[in-house]
Amino acid sequence: FKSINDTYGHLYGDYVLEEVSRIISKNVRSIDIVGRYGGEEFSVILVNTNIKDCIPLAEKIVKKIAKKTYLKDGIAVNLTISAGMSGFPVHSDSIRDLIGKADKAMYQTKLKGGNGVSIAE
């Protein structure tokens, strides 16, 4: 994502983040929580949902983000994301640990080439 900001500027980068946020928000339930966590990272809390039931949803969101062309002011960019998931209480009962495990899972996705989803071990 840094390359988008460096190439097209932060205003365009912000536009892309807003569009990604919209895609995520449109694909989760109203009781779920979507938030930006850090520069270009998002956290999604799927309330009362088994982690195995989250996989198809996460894969759907990853595909929708990759399918969209982010077009503004004559600039068109396509992007992919790497997602990592952890579940309460399966992987931990600590928010800090859950975020850390989801982060490690995200890096596993990146090591596999990105544009996908991995679950914490």
Identify the residue ranges that each predicted region occupies.
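Conserved long alpha-helical elements within nucleotide-processing catalytic cores of c-di-GMP signaling
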Residues: 2-26, 35-39, 43-44, 51-59, ...
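Conserved beta-strand positions that form and line the central face of beta-propeller blades
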Residues: 3, 33, 116-119
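Short catalytic/binding micro-motifs of nucleotide second-messenger systems
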Residues: 26-31, 63-75, 106-108
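A short pre-motif secondary-structure segment
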Residues: 33-36, 77
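A general secondary-structure junction signal
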Residues: 38, 81-87, 119-121
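Catalytic strand-loop-helix junctions within cyclic-nucleotide turnover domains
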Residues: 45-54, 73-76, 81-98
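Catalytic-core segments of nucleotide cyclases and related cyclic-nucleotide turnover enzymes
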Residues: 55, 88-120
